[in-house]
Amino acid sequence: MTEGSVWRHIVRFALPVFWGNLFQQLYNVVDSLVVGNFLGSDALAAVGSSSHLIFLLVGLFSGIFTGASVVISRYYGARDDAGVRTAVHTTVAFGLVAGVVITIAGVLLTPRLLIWMGTPESVLPNSILYFRIYFGGIIFVILYNTAAGIFQAVGDSRHPLYYLIVSSVVNVVLDLLFVAGFGMGVDGAALATVISQAASAALGFWRLCHTTGSYRIWFRKVRFHGRTLRQLLTLGIPSGVQNSIIAIANVVVQSSINLYGPMAMAGCGSYSKIEGFGFLPINSFALALATFIGQNLGAKQYDRARRGARFGILCSLLMAEVVGVGINLLAPWLISLFNGDPQVIAFGTLQARTVTLFYFLLAFSHSVAGVMRGAGRAIVPMLVMLVCWCVIRVSYIMLVARASGNIQMVFWAYPITWALSSVAFLIYFLRGDWLHYLERKERAA
């Protein structure tokens, strides 16, 4: 990524990430489609409200993997093979520990968290069952993310795409087999998801154990290396804290939606699956930018990093808004695919039409955050999102949205806080402090 056409490198990296995330989102949607059509609206509500709670427990560690990917990309850009090997094996060690911790925490805390979120009693048993099975196999999600982060750090976004395609096909087949064929409930949907995630993790690690590159994994070398671990945590903890505070704020939003009953939960849960498609270009370019910026700053290509940042941010904005407009226009039909109940469709459509035209604000915030992480300034997006997406969003929900008694006021929490974070990121990005941060840090050391 440090030589040749800037835009080609970014697009070639982002496209496989986009397609991989698309397949991942499709199998999340299939879960909800099968559950909603075969098991009804209460079961759909149980599964549909899952994303925020899962991200609450996984977000901290996934942020640290983002930091690990930046560290590996920097060593890779600087042609430091020994540094790459040390960072890779430290990342794998961290992934194994993280998987065990999240499994235990998820299984034990699920009932308390769901009750705290105000989950209706009619939905609670299915929610607990689904989450406990899901968290029982969460280590496979962590290990796949570990492998994908290593591939992406060295500029390989194709192999994660292949593994997600396999995982998606396995998930669709098992969803239909377990739920439609064997007559299982939400436990069948959860089990299908766990097995499909295990398949993608196994494929990723098999490839990493057989590559000839400096990022090859040797399990006998998997251990924590103190200096590298500190680098991972220095870059990763701000991203992890950022993920966690966003998740906490979104759980508060979800708990406000839960107050309006199972139909609102089912409708908004259906929209959240559709919203994932809006996030595809945003996430793809944010990852591409973090890797591109990391490698080019590692190679001291500062002007190239600046040009790449501008190009990637613009592409992310345009693509996110195109998807947002499409979802806005097709919202009633899209929601009806999950469940035909008019109330479910009405709630999901209302949320979609409140927020989707503002996807460009979400895209800008995430893209600039990707640039900052690649530049080693992960603390900046953490602070911006702590204030805008947590403190202000939760305050708005508690002081304005709940007092109004109008669910649409809950939905407005998202575009309002996206706008505020975009203003903050724009100011910092234009100052340009991020570009030479690593150079100043190395000089000071």
Language-model features, listed with the residues they occupy:
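N-terminal transmembrane alpha-helices
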Residues: 2-38, 52-67, 71, 96-103, ...
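Helix-terminus/linker motif at the lipid-water interface of multi-pass membrane proteins
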Residues: 26-44, 114-121, 177-184, 244-273, ...
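Short runs within selected transmembrane alpha-helices of multi-pass transporters and secretion channels
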Residues: 65, 134-152, 160-168, 189-202, ...
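Transmembrane helical elements of multi-pass membrane transporters/channels
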Residues: 12-31, 133, 144, 167, ...
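Small-residue-rich hydrophobic transmembrane alpha-helices
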Residues: 44-104, 141-160, 254, 268-331, ...
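Transmembrane alpha-helix boundary and packing residues in multipass membrane permease domains
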Residues: 17, 21, 33, 37, ...
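Small-residue hotspots at the loop-to-helix junctions and early N-terminal turns
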Residues: 39-52, 127, 131, 190, ...
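Short alpha-helical transmembrane segments in multi-pass integral membrane proteins
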Residues: 1-14, 72-137, 181-237, 293-358, ...
